[in-house]
Amino acid sequence: MPISRRNFHLFLGAAALGGATSSIPMSAGLKTAADQKGSAPYFFKDRTFETIFLTSLGRAYHSGGNPGKILYLTRQVKDGDFESAFTAFRQAGDEARGQAEESLAGGHRESARQAYLWAQNFYDSATYFADGSADPSRFLPAWEALYDCWVKSLPLFDPPIEPVSIPYEGTMLRGFYMRGKSKERQRPLLILVNGSDGSLLDMWLWGGAGGTARGYDCLTFDGPGQGYALWKQKLYFRPDWEKVIGPVVDFALSRTDVDPKRIAIQGISQGGYWVPRAIAFEERIAAAIADPGVTDVSTSWTATLPPPLLALLKAGNKAEFDSFLEKALPPASRATLNFRMRPFGFTSYFDTYKATLDYNLRDVANKIRCPLLITAPVNEIYWPGQSQQLYEMATSSSSKKLVEFTEADGADLHCEPQSTGIRDLRVFDWLDQTLSVKG
């Protein structure tokens, strides 16, 4: 059947989100799966806006945001207006960074640390609206401000977060080592793996804060296609994530303070694919968490493609596939899709969509042997049903658990954005028991 622009916009959905590979997916005016599903909104009818604001609010649990300011911003932003959202969050970030610098100059280190975390929250939120705004080029300066605040916050933690360099295929990945409260000479370690466009702040808030408080050391990093590795090192996604995690584990084992028998790993958002893929090959991992389980990344790109476009993809018709998308997408949506393609390292729509087909666990999930916890948030929009699929596919896991998060918990939606507390409780209680940690 012919593909009209109207039908294309109705069908494209999550594909325009670039696979919804982060804890905070976005679009630029397209109708998406996010518009059709989910719990009743608290603030915005536009599911993109709702998700980003809920995530921003959820970050406050571990001092990553000022709830009153976030609630104030919900009244300053027009539903669906990307320009107003970008401006509001960017200005809030500048304001919080100014507060941090003023506190630091006055010797108030804890106040400065918290304000730098607030600034990161606001700057990161701004980046998700940049591509649908009047000037998408403002993304990179906002990201650079976010990263600058992260770096400046590190020495203000107690103990300080330690910047580390992880050898990786002839270069170095930037990593960050978070010391836990345990006084053991060798401590359990939780490796924190991000999605595609999550911030380092989220690695602190969705694992680091809860882990260090319970006696775990934590290690996070920007891997290929993520953060600094993407924007400054030009390293791109790869489906064989065990080639990334192997060097990270090598680095961890080079430290005398890491207990080699108690190394765990957690992946959030698309990290729910990275981690199961890695542990299918990496046998030095003692336990793993996938939040949520992702068995096939490509479905969030291809599931809502109209059948004729899907046929072009399967037939390998690159020229026609690219030509249609280039003509059919309005400027804001094209900017969003082009941005979402960058972590894959391609400029062709066809090449990117085709590459996503390699990101699946079909032939490897049955090789997972370590204990595995898989979160299953109700109203998971981007990979619905895949947590259950991963649970069923991991037939060789020595112990596996599927943990549901519901609306009644206040913890539904992709990566439980507004409920890091209940998430920490369930994830770390399981991990404590699995690794015999007294958290």
Residue locations for each model-derived region?
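Catalytic histidine neighborhood in serine/cysteine hydrolases
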Residues: 395-411
